[in-house]
């Protein structure tokens, strides 16, 4: 047997991506806020000015939208059992202003008290908390999840006839 030289590798050559391409790659996976996208680009070694320009370009072309991002966060967190206080705080960490946060919270079409009741039913069964200790645990759970006092009070009272 004769030895042959290994065939040259035929693969894709790596081309350096532009800041816009890097940002678009992040946006394809999931929505990002402008602040979050800018921070991620800078963490990947892109100059702050180039990162900001890329984010602004994608926002101008409709690829990035803070309102759409915020509405998506509200929808996802509400369906995961989080309350309005938690969601507002999370949106604030993404660098959204109070107007965008309020607009996103207004897109929620459900009832926060009903969401709290659903969460309690999932954790404590259909009958809900039966004694005072379980009611306290349920109230603590709802408070940790970011529900307001009124929703907690109504959800932990748990009168099925009401």
UniProtKB/Swiss-Prot annotation:
Principal subcellular localization: cytoplasm
Name recorded for this polypeptide: Regulatory protein RecX
Transmembrane segments: none
Keyword presence, Cytoplasm: yes
Alphabetized Pfam families for the sequence: RecX_HTH1, RecX_HTH2, RecX_HTH3
Subcellular localization, as worded in the UniProt entry: Cytoplasm
NCBIfam families with a match to the protein in the record: PRK00117.2-1 (NF001054)
GO biological process annotation, one example: regulation of DNA repair
Organism: Xanthomonas campestris pv. campestris (strain ATCC 33913 / DSM 3586 / NCPPB 528 / LMG 568 / P 25)
Keyword Cell inner membrane: no
GO cellular component term, pick one: cytoplasm
Described function: Modulates RecA activity.
InterPro entries membership: RecX_HTH_1st (IPR053926), RecX_HTH_2nd (IPR053924), RecX_HTH_3rd (IPR053925), Regulatory_RecX (IPR003783), WH-like_DNA-bd_sf (IPR036388)
Family listed: Belongs to the RecX family.
Keywords from the UniProt entry: Cytoplasm
């Amino acid at each position: 047997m004769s030895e042959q030289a290994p065939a040259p590798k035929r693969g894709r050559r790596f081309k350096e991506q532009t800041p816009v391409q890097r940002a678009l790659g992040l946006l394809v996976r999931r929505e990002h806020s402008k602040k979050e996208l800018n921070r991620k680009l800078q963490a990947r070694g892109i100059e702050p000015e180039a990162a900001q320009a890329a984010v602004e370009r994608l926002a101008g072309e409709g690829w990035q939208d803070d309102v759409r991002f915020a509405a998506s966060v509200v929808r996802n967190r509400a369906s995961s059992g989080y309350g309005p206080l938690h969601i507002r705080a999370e949106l604030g960490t993404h660098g959204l202003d109070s107007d965008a946060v309020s607009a996103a919270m207004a897109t929620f079409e459900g009832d926060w008290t009903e969401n709290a009741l659903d969460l309690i039913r999932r954790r404590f069964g259909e009958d809900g908390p039966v004694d005072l200790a379980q009611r306290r645990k349920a109230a603590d759970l709802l408070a940790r999840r970011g529900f307001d006092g009124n929703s907690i009070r109504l959800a932990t009272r748990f009168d099925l006839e009401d």
